[in-house]
């Protein structure tokens, strides 16, 4: 088939093609229009987004401006009352107002400042930082004022504690710090710290203030009872306790009463964990004070004479009391202080054991060091007896002798020494050994001095009588047997006889083979006259010399002078009276006043004057 269908309709095809081209053009135009519209729509959409952002930004800026205005308003309020608060802080230091009033005022001001600080802390305003710094400074100043007021209040409690120092060492009554209303006060400040100050990084520092004042108070109480100042009048029970005791003993027992009181008060004011943490901080200064003093005294005790260390025997008792108090009164354990006490006990035991040995070997059994005196007894003699008395008195010290062993105090032990069946026997042997050896040492030392002569009897008699009296009036008597007391009595009699020899020598001048005859000797030969003159002369010289020495330097122990005066009168006066009666009317001299210096009554008074200083 030639051509095709379009060959037959060529005109129609052309028309169709034209129409198709026209439609295509219309479609292209429509597409362009649509593209243009799309572009315009895209532009409108972008403009709408910008507009939406602008609206959002506007709203945000408006909100920020509003918030800023509010912050500025708050800042203005804070600025307006800061001067008022500052003035209030100054008034809180007004001494004319009560401490409680000032305390309430400063707490109110601090609460207001803390609120201001919290407000400023979240402020977005850059210039608010300066205001915050100002508030910080005022908070710091207010906390210092609060701390000072707390210090004053706690000092009041400390002062009332010092008023109780008089009963601290009266072991018959319990002792505690006066803390009425203290718990309420401390609780108030602690709650204020937690609610107001801690959130703004501030504090009243109440715990450290309490630690400082309580620590100082404990030290002051120690000084008060150990120094026994006029400001502190100890009651009778405390006076009885401190009498005759060293500072170490007093301080240890005082601490054993103070430390439990501190611990108990801490548990009243704080929880147990806090109380145990604060306790060592409070008591450390006092314990250090006692520790340092004790260490220094240990060196003194080691160098001191053995007899002087008798006071340490009471320390053994005090250490026992200290341990008992710490075990019975402490609400929680203080192992450190108990360790210190036990250490002191061990050290003092060593010193005492050494002193027990040195008292015998270095003092009693040493004739080179014993003092020789006719003025009653020496300080050394007093010291020996005080040591022996304390040793017998303190039952807690008896184990010291037991640790030494029977006769263990001697450098050399003889086979014939008496055995011991008990600590009491050891104590008895030690006491008697010390007294016997001391008397022997004094006698040996006196015999080596030519000028002592009859005065040796005075020395030994004074010591012997003193020993005997002290044994009988003390607990030593419970350790001794009858044979021991008889031995002391025999020694006193022996030394009395030794002393009386000088008076017998005086009275020897009055002996006369004819004195027993009743008649007076009216006429005498020349030889008899000279003998009689010599007798009167010797008697006068001797008795005057003896009486003069007695007046100047002889002093007898209580009771000895009365006894000896009677013995002397019985020895001298009868012979003199007979001699006087026999020759008063004789012709042995024309100048009787020269030879007969004493009437019978005068001689009695003259001899009495020798003993008067001791009566």
Swiss-Prot record:
One of its GO terms (cellular component) is exocyst. Keywords: Exocytosis, Phosphoprotein, Protein transport, Transport. One of its GO terms (biological process) is intracellular protein transport. Required for exocytosis. The keyword Transport applies. PANTHER family: EXOCYST COMPLEX COMPONENT 7, EXOCYST COMPLEX PROTEIN EXO70. One of its GO terms (molecular function) is phosphatidylinositol-4,5-bisphosphate binding. Pfam families: Exo70_C. This is Exocyst complex component exo70. The exocyst complex is composed of sec3, sec5, sec6, sec8, sec10, sec15, exo70 and exo84. It comes from the Eukaryota.
